[in-house]
């Protein structure tokens, strides 16, 4: 029997590390289809920290894609589980027949589903990628992304699956005994990536609340982002007093990030696509409601789990935020489908489907 190969086709260190550690800790011991990986990026100790996995590293997207295509052509029974993707050569290989639909299983992370870039090369590539996506054997995604994908690709099989956010289930009740009062603290964005549209988000928060709230903007990831961080800082200082604006330019360790989130009263995410599910999960776990763009389909997943959702188009004030906090406090967080360990069942099913052993 041919063992399933997992492909992390783009160098996204934080996400790739999360996936590898999740497979090593939660899946590899019980499934032979959870052990083989091809990854773009440097080892940086990952092999040592994930001893249950066999990981082959590649210096770039093209070299990985060439290796995947060669394996696919050499053995048409070989199946691949593409996580996130973000690799144009692989899409073109699927479109041209280098990789067959029966070999291609894709976990949607968001960016490769939406067509938000305005550059000419992207405009030329998007129609080809759309054609290739019609040939995917099966897609795995959030409820909202499945709905979005089905509008243009109704014949492609879709299965519910959530990114394996690092979470401690014992913290599900950590917010229940906390009293929230006084000046509100609002988290803006989930990272320093431009897709967070930080300046527009800061303006939106100011329009709703003025300079009456403290705004925290985590921008420690990705690295080498100093020019953009300074641009956001200057824009923020035009809107908020210095004491009400906190720009975090250093990457925080997980426990420090958790502690930061617990000090917030609201998360504000203006982006119009599904992203940042990890931060959303950690905020919800801490009893902190989130404001989403109505175009972000993840609101469908939240309402399915009976979670309060606020939108950027709503008229927001402190009373509305406090009411959302009260509603969130009444939810049994141990039942939320996209929380750990509940998402594990979806991963076990996804492995079986991608390996050709499931219904």
Curated annotation (Swiss-Prot):
It holds the Pfam family Glyco_transf_56. It is an enzyme of class 2 (transferase). Keywords: Cell inner membrane, Cell membrane, Glycosyltransferase, Membrane, Transferase. One of its GO terms (molecular function) is fucosyltransferase activity. GO terms for biological process: enterobacterial common antigen biosynthetic process; fucosylation. InterPro entries: WecF. It catalyses: beta-D-ManNAcA-(1->4)-alpha-D-GlcNAc-di-trans,octa-cis-undecaprenyl diphosphate + dTDP-4-acetamido-4,6-dideoxy-alpha-D-galactose = alpha-D-FucNAc4-(1->4)-beta-D-ManNAcA-(1->4)-D-GlcNAc-undecaprenyl diphosphate + dTDP + H(+). Pathway: Bacterial outer membrane biogenesis; enterobacterial common antigen biosynthesis. It is a peripheral membrane protein. Coiled coil: none annotated. It comes from the Bacteria. GO terms for cellular component: plasma membrane. It is found in: Cell inner membrane. HAMAP family: WecF_RffT. Catalyzes the synthesis of Und-PP-GlcNAc-ManNAcA-Fuc4NAc (Lipid III), the third lipid-linked intermediate involved in ECA synthesis. Belongs to the glycosyltransferase 56 family. This is TDP-N-acetylfucosamine:lipid II N-acetylfucosaminyltransferase.
């Amino acid at each position: 029997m041919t063992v399933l190969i997992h492909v992390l086709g783009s160098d996204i260190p934080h996400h790739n590390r999360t996936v590898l550690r999740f497979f090593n800790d939660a899946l590899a011991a019980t499934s032979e289809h959870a052990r083989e990986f091809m990854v773009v990026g440097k080892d940086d100790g990952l092999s040592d920290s994930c001893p249950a996995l066999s990981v082959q590293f590649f210096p770039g997207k093209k070299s990985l894609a060439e290796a995947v295509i060669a394996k696919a052509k050499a053995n048409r029974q070989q199946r691949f589980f593409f996580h996130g993707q973000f690799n144009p050569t692989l899409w073109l290989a699927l479109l041209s027949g280098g990789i067959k639909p029966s070999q291609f299983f894709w976990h949607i992370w968001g960016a490769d589903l939406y067509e938000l870039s305005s550059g000419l090369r992207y405009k030329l590539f998007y129609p080809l990628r759309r054609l290739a996506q019609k040939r995917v054997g099966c897609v795995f995604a959030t409820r909202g992304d499945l709905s979005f994908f089905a509008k243009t690709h109704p014949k492609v099989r879709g299965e519910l699956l959530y990114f394996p956010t690092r979470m401690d289930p014992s913290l599900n009740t950590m917010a229940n005994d906390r009293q929230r009062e006084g000046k509100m603290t609002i988290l803006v964005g989930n990272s320093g990536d431009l897709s967070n549209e930080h300046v527009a988000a800061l303006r939106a928060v100011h329009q709703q609340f003025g300079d009456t709230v403290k705004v925290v903007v985590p921008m420690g990831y990705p690295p080498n982002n100093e020019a953009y961080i300074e641009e956001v800082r200057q824009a923020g200082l035009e809107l908020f007093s210095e004491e009400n604006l906190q720009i975090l330019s250093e990457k925080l360790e997980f426990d420090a990030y958790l502690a930061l989130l617990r000090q917030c009263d609201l998360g504000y995410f203006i982006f119009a696509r599904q992203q940042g599910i990890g931060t959303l999960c950690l905020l919800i776990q801490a009893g902190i409601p989130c404001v989403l763009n109505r175009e972000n389909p993840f609101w469908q997943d939240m309402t399915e789990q009976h979670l309060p959702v606020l939108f950027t188009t709503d008229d927001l004030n402190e009373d509305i935020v406090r009411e959302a906090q009260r509603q969130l406090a009444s939810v049994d967080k141990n039942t939320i489908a996209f929380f750990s360990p509940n998402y594990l069942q979806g991963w076990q099913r996804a492995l079986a489907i991608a390996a050709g052993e499931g219904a």
